Amino acid sequence: MAFLLHQARFYTTVNHLRDLPPTVQPEIAFAGRSNAGKSTAINVLCNQKRLAFASKTPGRTQHINYFSVGPAAEPVANLVDLPGYGYAEVPGAAKAHWEMLLSSYLATRSQLCGLILMMDSRRPLTDLDRRMIEWFVPTGKPIHTLLTKCDKLTRQESINALRNTQKGLDAYREQGVKGKLTVQLFSALKRTGLDEAHELIESWVRPSVADEKSEPVAQ
């Protein structure tokens, strides 16, 4: 999948549900608070510097951006960059539009096979992060959390952040949530967790390939 993600290109941008592309390829959505490092993480995962753009004004971008991955003639999946959330100075009308767009997309998009949720490792699981989770968990599809900027933490702080976030996610399972809720440390700067994230996305997009890799080789 690393090589597959490295074949990523801009596909389209969407501001209304009616404009979502009529594609059939599986989609992986990326969500996170403004300044959680979402655009940087996407660029590192795709081995590009300027694929996903971060607005200089947090909360300014309110569009859904699509990036196709795989061969240009026959893309095998789409990465979907959702608008960042949580910036206090965004006008009320923009917040309402963001809430409608994201909640409807996450709840109803049949092509969506999983959600990558970006959280700053220094302050994970805010109320808005929980809202994103609660919009998506009814689908039964997996959510994988990247605790970004973990290079800014000490080893013990990283352990605590990982443990506390997993505990928060486990609470949803105790409520009967069926989809997988997993978490890992990630640093775009140090490339920490890059291989793990690649492998997980591969298992979502091409589960048959991932299953073959996990099967023991016959002797």
UniProtKB/Swiss-Prot annotation:
Gene3D superfamilies according to UniProt: P-loop containing nucleotide triphosphate hydrolases
Molecular-function GO terms, alphabetical: GTP binding; metal ion binding
UniProt keywords, alphabetically: Cell cycle, Cell division, GTP-binding, Magnesium, Metal-binding, Nucleotide-binding, Septation
Domain EngB-type G: 24-207
Binding sites annotated in the UniProt record for GTP: 32-39, 59-63, 81-84, 148-151, 186-188
Top-rank taxon: Bacteria
One Pfam family here: MMR_HSR1
GO cellular component: cytosol
PROSITE patterns found in the cross-reference section: G_ENGB (PS51706)
Cofactor entry: Mg(2+)
Residues the record lists as binding Mg(2+): 39, 61
GO BP annotation list: division septum assembly
NCBIfam families: GTPase_YsxC (TIGR03598)
Record function comment: Necessary for normal cell division and for the maintenance of normal septation.
PANTHER family in alphabetical order: ENGB-TYPE G DOMAIN-CONTAINING PROTEIN, MSS1/TRME-RELATED GTP-BINDING PROTEIN
Protein family: Belongs to the TRAFAC class TrmE-Era-EngA-EngB-Septin-like GTPase superfamily. EngB GTPase family.
Protein name: Probable GTP-binding protein EngB
Gene name tied to this protein: engB
